[in-house]
Every structure is written in C-alpha cells, then in structure tokens.
C-alpha cells in the first residue's frame, strides 16, 4: 500500500458512517495525522486529540507549519463529548496497546473523559511492532467486548511501513555512492542483508563494516576498521553516590 491508498481507505471508512470514529496511529506520523484531519474536515466532523505525545506533536507541527489544519476543525476533548457522535473524530495514542495510553484506558474503562459506546468505529492505523502483538490483541478484545467495531486488519491498507524496501535502499546507495558503508538499526540478520545489498551496489567488501554495540569504528580517508570494543549496554544506578553521577540523575 502507498500513503495515497491509506487516504483512500480512510475516505471509504468515513463515508456513510453515522457513528463516532476513533483512530489510533503513531504519534510521530505527522502525515497520517494530516490525512485524518483532512478526511474529517471533508465529512464535516470535528477532531479531538487524546494522548500527551499526540497533543505535543500536533502542537509543534502546527507551529512549524508542517500541518495545514482547517479553521474550526479541532476541538477540545471536553467539547467533543457534547457533539453528536456522527460529527466527531477522536485521534488517540495507543496503537501498540501500551499500558496507560489513551486507547488502552478507553478500552479498559479507565479514561476520564471518553467512554467507548456500542457502535463506535475504532480504526487502528498502524502495524504491530514485533513483541506487541499480545497487548494489542488484549486492547482489541476489550473494545469488541464494549460493542465497538474495530478495524485493524492489515489487508485494509490502513498503514504503510516507514522502513525502506530493498529497491529504495539501492536507490539511496546509488545516489550517495558511499566509500564506506555501515548498516545500522535492526536485527543482525537485517544488517547482513543490507551489507550484501551494499556489495551488489559496488561497495568494496573491505569498506563495509557490520558493528555490534560496543564496537569501536576508526575511519580515515583511505580505510575503515573495526577491531576494538568498549563496554556498552544498560547502566543501572542505585543511589546518588555510585560513580560519577550528576545530581540531575
């Protein structure tokens, strides 16, 4: 799916819906927030935000003009409760089933302002990050228990991966033409595959380094090497007198 397809999916789900719509997505996905606000405005719905991270992102994106929000579309959460359900959209945090996120609290009747009503259409516009499947399933089950219609199936084209495909990685390597290449971020098998891609794109094997946490990388104009290691990982501090710990900690 493409971002255009996601917008089309939103349009279909809003069209003819006479119930309240609650959408959860990644708070950092500014473009997705813009898509939701656009389709809400198209169908005459007011939009409210719940979830601190979502509120902060929307505020900063608006100030920096990264988003175009039509006049009179946004309303406070307290006000949206007083409007007809078919005229409202709530954008919420909690797409990964995080405990104490806005959607989680709504699902388990712990949200102070929003109560899930039978017929509410809940749209999960995000894919599950590996490891979060169980918590997301619990939230979805609770929403169904409360009579909500939950739309989350990956075949509905409600989310697009933010990670580059192999062809996009190839294009980036072709544009940048790096002399040295260090694949980062992801599981080790992913780094191996990315390194193979670099070799396919003409980077000399000796100039490709796969470095695990703690490895020291030395780069000069002519060469790159990775031989030494330093201690790296979680550091747990118990008390204020352990090591060189500043008062801020």
Language-model features: where?
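Acidic/His-rich, metal-assisted hydrolase cores and their charged scaffolds
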Residues: 1-249
